[in-house]
A protein has these predicted regions:
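Acidic/His- and Gly-rich active-site-bordering loop/insert found
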Residues: 2-101, 128-130, 350, 360
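Metal-dependent amide/peptide-bond hydrolase catalytic core
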Residues: 5, 12, 49, 183-392
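Residue-level signal for inorganic ion chemistry
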Residues: 17, 21, 41, 166, ...
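Short helix-capping segments at alpha-helix termini
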Residues: 44, 126-130, 280-286
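Acidic-glycine-rich active-site phosphate/pyrophosphate-binding loop
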Residues: 83-97, 174-185, 321-322
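Short glycine/proline-enriched loop/turn "hinge" motifs that connect secondary-structure elements
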Residues: 85-86, 128, 173-179, 245-250, ...
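Phosphate-handling active-site elements
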Residues: 87, 97-99, 119-135, 213-224, ...
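Acidic/histidine-rich catalytic neighborhood of metal-dependent amide-processing enzymes
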Residues: 109-181, 391-392
Length: 392
């Protein structure tokens, strides 16, 4: 790394961010970590401001201005995390062990945010005035509603390209699937378990629906393929019904995670489930079910849209060039990954966007979430080179 910034800076910054809990069970969630990032950027000479998203929940927007002659680049990273749940170690200690930094959010994705900030300061402290601006959007809420990056786009911030720093293990993603969470509520009729014929068992009806979806819809999804993101997929994530063994279940819910391709849309996704429900209703007059879009996943106005690949965009070419030179081989193009805020930036912000960041996706949300310290150091260099090449 350039002498303008040391390796210790990015490691220490990552540790500081991990030590500040910012998940949904924390009061005001990301407010404390946002304040830390704001003060850190301001202290180190970046232009910085808050975006008030909801109550005390704020995005942090930091800028390293250029000469106004080159392309502008967004570094986007989310500052919320999933809760620690039952981790294998203290989730907010941010200790370093066997070459890894440990803790909730280190990999997904406070490490990347630290790398982005450090890269901006690296360029600033080297005295390199680039042609274009570098804009950090440290956003709230990606793990649920993505209200932070939705607010960024609605605020009018734009650029010629964007990097979303989700972990990519020295590869990159040009596209990913859209995301929709659906809840299907099945209605039955309660009765005593000794006389079940007087009731309508909602769990049995749910089982019938699941079998029909597996038989009719899932094979169709496997046939839908996209060069940059793999097949269309779905998952039954939760089923819950009934009250006790001695009663016929009068209700049952099924929650579905649906990952859809650019050739699909939310309306079509819902219709495919509704068509199966309607088919069962014609066979079984006692079958009652309705589909609900889950509130915990609904954005304000936007959908969790796909990241539509733009392989010929300047940002895609720059990321490819920098990664190839850094690892001295062809970088892997990831195709089967989770949803990211890149979908919002590309679909609604109309900004060509690429996903690449330190760490490995397999450690995100994991009981042993960790990130290689060397990845943090290396990605400061990678982000620095991407910015210098793209914004020159």
């Amino acid at each position: 790394m350039s002498e303008a910034f040391s390796a210790n800076d990015v490691v220490k910054l990552t540790q500081d961010l991990v030590k500040i809990p910012s998940h949904k069970f924390v009061e005001n969630r990301e407010s404390e970590v946002a304040e830390f990032i704001y003060n850190y950027c301001k202290k180190n000479g970046l232009e910085v401001e808050y975006q008030q998203v909801e109550g005390l929940r704020r995005n942090v927007i930091a800028k390293l201005k250029g000469k106004g002659t080159g392309k502008n680049l967004i570094f986007n990273g989310h500052i919320d995390t999933v809760p620690p749940y039952e981790m294998e170690f203290e989730p907010f200690s941010a200790e370093i062990k066997d070459g890894y930094l440990l803790g909730r959010g280190c990999n997904d994705m406070k490490g990347a945010v630290a790398c982005m900030i450090t890269a901006m300061l690296n360029i600033k402290n080297k005295g390199n005035l680039l042609g274009g601006d570098i804009i950090l959007t440290a956003a709230v809420g990606e793990e649920e509603k993505s209200d932070g990056t939705e607010f960024v786009v609605k605020s009018g911030i734009t650029a010629d390209g964007a990097i979303v720093g989700e972990p990519a293990n020295y590869g990159y993603a040009l596209g990913h699937r859209g995301l929709e969470w659906l809840e299907i509520r099945i209605e039955g009729k309660i009765a005593h378990g000794g006389i079940p014929e007087l009731g309508i068992n909602a769990i049995s009806k749910a089982a019938k629906l699941i079998r029909r979806i597996e038989e009719q819809l899932m094979p169709k999804l496997k046939e839908r393929q996209n060069e940059w993101m793999g097949p269309s997929v779905m998952n039954f994530g939760l089923i819950k019904g009934g009250t006790q063994p001695s009663s016929v279940a009068d209700s049952c819910i099924i929650q579905i995670d649906r990952r859809y391709l650019p050739v699909e849309n939310v309306e079509g996704v819902i219709k495919e489930y509704q068509d199966i429900i309607d088919e069962i209703k014609t066979e079984d007059p006692e079958f009652k079910a309705e589909i609900i879009r889950m509130d915990s996943n609904l954005m304000d106005e936007f959908d969790h849209a796909p990241l539509i690949a733009q392989p010929d965009s300047d940002i895609a070419k720059t990321v490819y060039k920098v990664l190839k030179e850094f690892i001295n081989k062809e970088p892997n193009i990831e195709k089967r990954r989770g949803w990211t805020d890149a979908g919002v930036l590309s679909t609604y912000g109309k900004i060509p966007t690429v996903v690449t960041g330190p760490g490995d996706l397999k450690y995100s949300h994991a009981k042993n979430e960790k990130i290689p310290v060397v990845d943090l150091v290396n990605y400061v260099e990678i982000y620095t080179k991407i910015a210098e090449e793209f914004c020159k």
